[in-house]
């Protein structure tokens, strides 16, 4: 039986975070830059869309004005991001999961570096997702056959009820360096009989796959759900807020920028060196994400 993915996302300002979901996005061409994968317009969150809901928007730059016929392949993946076996493309995609071109193209104008901006949204007239799950999108040059990048996102259905709480009163310390998650899920709508085999649970700090806690054993199990309380696997280092910087103008430094220089071909912005913060300081930030 396929394992449905239950992803519990923790998004608190006090939790250290970076856009570690990017480890599942891999650029393989030196000409490709600025890859962004966004659900709807919510660039601050992980790329998670609801089935038949908001679109997944993918954009990137090719650092040339040369014509490339970029096409994409969409693959359904298991909870561990391996490609799903035993299903057909027609099971998860209405239309074409492979071979469609990316036609939304815009060339740069009056820029120091030439680039061509590409945009792709799913669903589109050629492809509509029919099944929830993890998805990997591979973009390749049809003429040369080379993969230029892969991008990953999730499509979910609200079939499981989840609740959670986060506290600084942990089994390690109180109001110091750690935070602890308590979570509960109710899967009565799914008719699950063997949760250990049929559920795949993931708890993350602000989308950080590098510190994800996967399939932690629950403290309590009922006929319709699981509950985690005082679970040592759900204790996270609190960390601190990210230091921010903004590159808004090439004529003078802006927030977090030491200086901006011109080498005759490109502008280079040097980020100001900050001292480590010995104690937690609240500063509203984007949790390591970026906006281009």
Q: What residues fall within each predicted segment?
A:
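Short acidic/polar inter-strand loop motif in beta-rich domains
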Residues: 79-81, 127, 141-148, 208-210, ...
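Extended low-complexity, serine/threonine- and proline-enriched intrinsically disordered segments
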Residues: 66-96, 193-216
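Aromatic sugar-binding surface patches on proteins
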Residues: 101-104, 109-123, 222-244
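Ligand-binding face of N-terminal immunoglobulin V-set domains in extracellular IgSF glycoproteins
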Residues: 114-142
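Low-complexity, Pro/Ser/Thr- and charge-rich linker/hinge segments at domain boundaries
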Residues: 27, 155-178
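Contiguous beta-strand segments within globular domains
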Residues: 33-78, 174-185
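Catalytic cores of secreted or luminal carbohydrate-active enzymes
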Residues: 239-292
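Bacterial Sec-dependent N-terminal signal peptides
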Residues: 1-24
């Amino acid at each position: 039986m396929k394992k449905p993915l239950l992803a519990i996302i923790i998004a608190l300002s006090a939790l250290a975070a970076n856009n570690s979901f990017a480890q599942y996005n891999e650029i393989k061409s030196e000409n490709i830059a600025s890859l962004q994968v966004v659900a709807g317009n919510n660039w601050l969150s992980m790329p998670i869309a609801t089935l038949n809901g908001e679109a997944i928007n993918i954009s990137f730059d090719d650092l040339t004005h040369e014509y490339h016929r970029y096409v994409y392949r969409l693959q359904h993946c298991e909870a561990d991001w391996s490609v799903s076996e035993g299903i057909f493309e027609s099971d998860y995609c209405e239309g074409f999961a492979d071979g469609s071109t990316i036609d939304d193209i815009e060339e740069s104008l009056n820029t120091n570096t030439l680039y061509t901006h590409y945009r792709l949204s799913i669903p589109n007239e050629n492809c509509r997702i029919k099944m929830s799950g993890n998805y990997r999108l591979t973009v390749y040059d049809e003429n040369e056959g080379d993969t230029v990048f892969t991008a990953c996102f999730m499509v979910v259905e609200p079939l499981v009820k989840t609740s959670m709480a986060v506290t600084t009163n942990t089994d390690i310390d109180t109001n110091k360096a750690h935070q602890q998650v308590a979570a509960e899920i109710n899967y009565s709508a799914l008719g699950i009989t063997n949760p250990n085999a049929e559920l795949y649970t993931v708890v993350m700090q602000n989308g950080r796959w590098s510190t994800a806690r996967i399939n932690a054993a629950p403290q309590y199990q009922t006929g319709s759900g699981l509950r985690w309380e005082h679970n040592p696997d759900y204790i996270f280092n609190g960390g601190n807020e990210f230091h921010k910087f903004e590159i808004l103008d090439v004529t003078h430094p802006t927030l977090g920028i030491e200086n901006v220089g011109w080498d005759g071909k490109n502008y280079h912005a040097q980020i100001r060196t900050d001292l480590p913060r010995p104690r937690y300081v609240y500063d509203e930030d984007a949790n390591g994400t970026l906006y281009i």
